[in-house]
Amino acid sequence: MNENVIALDGPAGSGKSTVARQIAERIGFNYLDTGAFYRALTLYLFRLHGNSPNTESFADWVKTSEAERSLSDIRILCEFSAGKENRIFLNGEEVSLAIRTPEITREIKHIAKRRIYRNFVNQELHSLAKLHKLIIDGRDIGTEVFPDAKFKFYLTASSKVRAERRFLQLQEQGIEADRDEIEKEIILRDKSDMEREIAPLYQANDAILIDTDILSKNSVISKILKILDR
């Protein structure tokens, strides 16, 4: 059993990152957003595709040997900050905001469903878990990445509630967005995450389900802290 990792899984916008950050701060763990690693990887490949003299779509290009070989050139670093989002660096460049744009959100599904890219990210996560006590949020932390985590939680919420949360988050970052479009993208993302062949999104048998539609943020945090104190 891995006591260095607390796993929080669930669909996009279910409140995982907000809850995970605050719990990490209270119990002395580091919060790690796995989605940021996939976003940074997507950003790198998206830029590389844009500079490549090819006519393939991004979805097709990421399947090529050219794209896969580029993994050896990627360095993703995470700077922990108590109570705040991780600062993410891609080959020395801070990309904490660049990885959160709607454009990257739309393209990330092409990366997340390919085993070679998942293996790349998972190796990074396991390396960090050897050095730090982590509370990690993602889609498959308790089912695929750390199935031996001592504590596993699965957070969920309706697509409408999740879209509103994402809209407000983008507003705070100065990024223009449309609520309806965000909800459409969330629904499509859910479908893609749940139906993909590799590491689909689902609740682990031993994970505790928490519906954040009907609980306030503080209630969710209190509930998880009580379970961790058992």
Curated annotation (Swiss-Prot):
ATP binds at G10, P11, A12, G13, S14, G15, K16, S17, T18. One of its GO terms (molecular function) is dCMP kinase activity. SUPFAM superfamilies: P-loop containing nucleoside triphosphate hydrolases (SSF52540). GO terms for cellular component: cytosol. Its main location: cytoplasm. It catalyses: CMP + ATP = CDP + ADP; dCMP + ATP = dCDP + ADP. Its EC number is 2.7.4.25. It comes from the Bacteria. It is found in: Cytoplasm. One of its GO terms (biological process) is pyrimidine nucleotide metabolic process. Keywords: ATP-binding, Cytoplasm, Kinase, Nucleotide-binding, Transferase. PANTHER family: CYTIDYLATE KINASE (PTHR21299:SF2), CYTIDYLATE KINASE/PANTOATE-BETA-ALANINE LIGASE (PTHR21299). Belongs to the cytidylate kinase family. Type 1 subfamily. This is Cytidylate kinase. It comes from Leptospira borgpetersenii serovar Hardjo-bovis (strain L550). The lineage of its organism: Bacteria, Pseudomonadati, Spirochaetota, Spirochaetia, Leptospirales. The gene is cmk.
